[in-house]
A protein has these predicted regions:
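Extended recognition/assembly regions associated with phosphoester-bond processing machinery
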Residues: 1-582
């Protein structure tokens, strides 16, 4: 039966605060019409959205709700017994508003918008089944699974392998019997955690300029140290002798960068933040993009254009020593699974790929699972058309509760969920604060985007933002050769930041202060996770294993995820990785 606590909890689930007198009224109505609190609140939400523009309940509109809806059901009860022969309830926990008449009990249809319990009609000619799906959101229309995803034939296929052959032979084995005492922490930032209640975008121009200037100075000093350059001059200094200048790459127009539009902005200390056009005709090889900090050698005979001879951009530090902390060192082999959203196909909200991933985790029991958003993509058609009958946040909480149940089937698996600015229920800012949920699960930990994890001495960098694609759309490259994807990933390591592009892509809202405090990469990680729309890959770049698992779904079909096996040896570490189709 309904109680004040249950009714209050159900309203809070939808983010609604209700006065005590309304709570008492709801409890009495539940008792009068013999309905539980959850069903009552769901029916109220449907009625409110369709007739009251989503208004919160009060005594007056509750009376209207009862008069219009429950009186209909009371009038139909006299015919219920004769019409229910041969019908059995499905017991589905999924609420579907406006379900087809063929799967509804004739005597219980309140209206197309009312919450009803679908029935399975037993007839000889036609049999309609209604499968339950605890990962599907409440909706005003039934959600049908993707035919393309359901009929795929390459489930579990390994499409790419990398690393030590001996480890690859064991990478697919379950790890439930191999219990590791892992110590996992987030590598801290100087400014602490990102707060959800921060004033995002509140930027003073002089503070923003000072922050960028400080970043240019620091990165350019690292480049000088690595390249053996001793002294810098102003970007506007007139000289016929070869000099070195430092600054940030910019474009002279609001357009894509090209070799004739490159501008170099110097530091305040050396150049009073002045800019100078750059002539790259004499440079044999370079790879540049807006926001990149570089050091150039060349001449500037008139002070109006810097004729570059050589470009230096590598500020990457040394790879982190995996045994730097002897009290926190990996013992044995660690299994890791990495997956990136979206977690449902673009034509439905059934989250079948996520359920298959959960099944894989339950079977193989990896030590660590890293999942990057989005979980509820703001670009999904079902999100845009407003057919969900529950809040985005409440549905996300339901997804997390389902993941929390993995503690029963895979008790030693630790799940780290990295936020995404593309989630409909979260803040649209980068760097992105960590998620939060209504319930605490001991096996689930929320991380911001980006973040750096220390897993028993193994450093893992993670971001959910497609920085590889963003840089690719703005980069100009001459004479570099080699692999483009490795070069793009190398920019992140060499610039010591998860997002070196500035101005950012139009689809991304970047807070400059948060970027300076929380998007820096102070060390070269052993593993760097960079989900991207580019084809999946695993490559070693500057001593770091870069993993692009791609996405768990691709349109209406299935995608891929990555699995890794890391072993710590006396003198070195070994990493093996595979890309697997879901």
């Amino acid at each position: 039966m309904a109680s004040e606590e249950l009714v209050t909890e159900q309203f809070q689930f939808f983010g609604i605060d209700v006065p005590n007198e309304v709570i008492n009224k709801c409890v009495s109505l539940c008792d009068e019409y013999n309905i539980d609190a959850e069903s009552f609140i769901e029916q109220w939400m449907a009625f409110s959205l369709n007739h009251l523009n989503g208004s919160s309940p009060n005594l007056d509109n509750l009376d209207t709700f009862v008069r219009k809806e429950f009186s209909k059901r009371a009038a139909n009860r006299s015919n219920a017994t004769s019409k229910e022969n041969g019908q059995v309830g499905t017991g589905s926990s999924l609420t579907v508003y406006g379900a087809p008449a063929s799967v509804q009990s004739d005597n219980e249809v309140l209206s197309d918008y009312m919450a009803t319990t679908p029935k399975r009609v037993k007839v000889e000619i036609e049999s309609v089944s209604n499968q339950t799906n605890d990962l599907c959101p409440a909706s005003y229309s039934p959600s049908v699974g993707s035919n393309k995803y359901a009929t795929r034939t390459n489930v579990g296929a390994v499409v790419h392998s990398y690393g030590d052959e001996k480890l690859l032979q064991n990478i697919s084995e379950p790890c439930g019997h191999d219990v590791l005492n892992l110590k996992i922490t987030q590598v801290p930032n100087d400014d602490g955690d990102i707060y959800n209640k921060a004033m995002f975008g509140f930027e003073l121009l002089h503070e923003k300029a000072s922050m960028f200037d400080g970043n240019i100075r620091y990165v350019s000093q690292c480049i000088m140290k690595k390249s053996g350059i001793k002294e810098l001059t102003s970007v506007r200094c007139k000289t016929q002798a070869e000099v070195a200048v430092a600054g940030r790459i910019e474009c002279d127009a609001d357009a894509r960068l090209n070799p004739k539009s490159v501008v170099l902005q110097g530091t305040w200390e050396q150049s009073l933040s002045q800019t100078v056009p750059v002539d790259l005709d004499n440079v044999k090889q370079y790879s540049l993009f807006p926001g990149q900090t570089v050091v150039m050698k060349g001449v500037n005979t008139r002070g109006e254009k810097f004729v570059a001879h050589e470009v230096f951009c590598d500020a990457s530090p040394a790879v982190t020593d995996h045994k730097a902390d002897l009290t926190n060192t990996l013992q044995g082999k660690m299994s890791m699974v990495v997956a990136s959203g979206p977690y449902t196909t673009s034509d439905n909200m059934t989250y079948e790929p996520l359920k298959d991933l959960v099944t894989y985790i339950s079977t193989h029991q990896p030590h660590v699972v890293i999942m990057t958003g989005p979980f509820l993509d703001s670009d999904h058609t079902k999100v845009k058309d407003n057919t969900m009958a529950e809040t985005f946040k409440s549905f996300f909480d339901k997804l997390i509760d389902s993941l929390g149940e993995l503690s029963n089937t895979s008790p030693y698996t630790k799940i780290y969920i990295v936020s995404s600015n593309k989630d409909a229920f979260h803040v649209n800012i980068y760097p992105t604060p960590a998620y939060c949920s209504r319930r605490k699960h001991t096996n689930i930990h929320f991380m911001p985007d980006p973040c750096t994890l220390n897993i028993s001495g193994i450093i893992v960098g993670v971001t959910s933002t497609d920085i590889l694609m963003h840089i690719s759309q703005e980069e100009i490259s001459v004479g570099m050769g080699g692999d483009k994807l490795s070069r793009l990933a190398g920019h992140i390591l060499m610039q010591q930041t998860y997002y070196p592009l500035w101005p950012p892509a139009q689809s991304l809202s970047v807070d400059a202060a948060l970027w300076a405090a929380h998007a820096q990469l102070s060390c070269i990680p052993h593993v760097l996770v960079l989900p991207s729309n580019f084809r999946y890959f695993v490559k070693e770049v500057n001593g770091c294993v870069v993993v692009n698992p791609e996405h768990l779904t691709k349109g209406t079909g299935g995608g891929t995820f990555a699995r890794l096996l890391i072993q710590n040896l006396k003198d070195d570490k070994k990493i093996a990785a595979q890309i697997v189709r879901i």
